[in-house]
């Protein structure tokens, strides 16, 4: 099967190189698309959102646009979806673009970076701060048109099989952590691994890894992480608001009508709002279950660790920006917007939450 998949990708790449124009399958006026997801079909949030997005697009188009969702490892492996769509072997993907940072380090900024923009701030930058134009510029290099499609909000710091209180506690720790957050941990001496969502629980249970972040209480409980690790840390410094993308083959996108593109854009933006609202509501319910489990200890990373995370995060982001001119351009725009929302936030949301806590104590 792996050999066949490689052949499919190689064949699609050859077609693209020869100038072939990807086009949806059309039957009786219905355009059919293959959407490959980086997530298991039933995984709460990321997996279920892909299905819901496909249903929304079908409903909004009166059935004229039909997306068939292929969950992770069915048509292609989870981390191969970008290449599949780029080459034309699939039409669209649903994935966190940090997974594909080796294509361009700039992709990190359109998903989530340590101590970066929160979910609503990221939406503001992409929609009204110049982020979408930069994202289009980055992904166009790979024949991709990107759209925001999901946000799971602030992440948790992860599940551990022991307490961590000092930077030394991270030395030698086998930790499942994505992308730029992983680089922060490497500099603290951790051994960082990349593990697909459906393999995390087994890896923790077997002792192959000592700790793992994933998302938050809702999907973490569904995966069974609370059954195989006792210590649940917050906050997730590495992902303050994680965005997943709907990536569309660019040549295919350009061949759609204005109406069809508007339907897909509107459905994707609606799914961002819906997914974030759902994550907040379901995390509340799942957190109650975790608090009721006397074995699970929910702990905050102490101030000393947070300072170390912050210092190393600044270094990692600056070094990432220096990788190439386009990434520097994205970084400069992102950081300028971050400075602005932090300034405004001190007078608005941060102030409101602080005073609300005081008023309702």
What residue ranges belong to the model's regions?
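N-terminal secretory/targeting leader peptides
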Residues: 2-3, 9-19, 26-122, 132-133, ...
